[in-house]
């Protein structure tokens, strides 16, 4: 994971757990995914996109944009990766 404390975007590859993640575009996707979390211009919400690792098309994770907690974007991204690993149609909120 990008470790810079002032980063406005993080991107990581992760294997989705059983039940995958829920997207607005195509419903549930599963398997090896790339997750991108980007701070919105308001500085208080994050847009989350996912793709099958190695693919070109990105999908919006349901619930995105999501509020960024007090811990900041890095903390939100770490928590989100954990939820994706657990699966269960994980969402951005």
Language-model features: where?
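Negatively charged, low-complexity tracts enriched in Asp/Glu with abundant Ser/Thr
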Residues: 1-37
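A short, structured beta-strand/loop element
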Residues: 42-59
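Mixed-charge, Lys/Arg-enriched low-complexity segments
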Residues: 7-8, 57-59, 65-93
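A structural signal for beta-rich interaction modules in eukaryotic proteins
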Residues: 26-46, 77, 83-85, 89
